[in-house]
From Swiss-Prot:
An annotated GO BP: translation
Keyword tags: Ribonucleoprotein, Ribosomal protein
One Gene Ontology MF term: structural constituent of ribosome
Classification via PANTHER family: LARGE RIBOSOMAL SUBUNIT PROTEIN BL27M, RIBOSOMAL PROTEIN L27
Taxonomy of the source species: Bacteria, Bacillati, Mycoplasmatota, Mycoplasmoidales, Metamycoplasmataceae
Protein name, entry field: Large ribosomal subunit protein bL27
Organism (species): Metamycoplasma arthritidis (strain 158L3-1)
GO CC list: cytosolic large ribosomal subunit
Superkingdom of origin organism: Bacteria
Stored Gene3D superfamilies: 2.40.50.100
Chain intervals for the UniProt region annotation (Disordered): 1-21
UniProt similarity note: Belongs to the bacterial ribosomal protein bL27 family.
Pfam families per the UniProt record, alphabetical: Ribosomal_L27
HAMAP family reported in the protein's UniProt record: Ribosomal_bL27
Length: 90
């Protein structure tokens, strides 16, 4: 009976690929309607003006314009403003 028993398998030997989360459009960048602004799990950043939220909490632009990340009371928001609106504010 001089033989080795079968070795057990390891349970933790695999690693999943990264999910490519994070900022996809930076502050001040022009985006087209439907463009993804931020990929996230949960609402780390909330949708602001002209920004929608997908079922996986992805933020996307509802109109074409300039992205602005804003801090409001204890929350961060991503908004998209039309170029004409930004010119009118100046």
């Amino acid at each position: 009976m001089a033989h080795t028993k079968a070795g057990g398998t390891t349970r933790n030997s695999r690693d999943s690929a990264g999910r490519r989360l994070g900022v996809k459009a930076t502050d001040g960048q022009f985006v087209n309607a439907g463009s993804i602004i931020y990929r996230q799990r949960g609402t780390k950043i909330f949708p602001g003006n002209n920004v929608g939220r997908g079922k996986d909490d992805t933020l996307f632009a509802l109109i074409s314009g300039i992205v602005k990340f804003e801090d409001r009371i204890n929350r961060k928001f991503a908004s998209v403003y039309a170029v004409e609106d930004l010119k009118a504010k100046k």
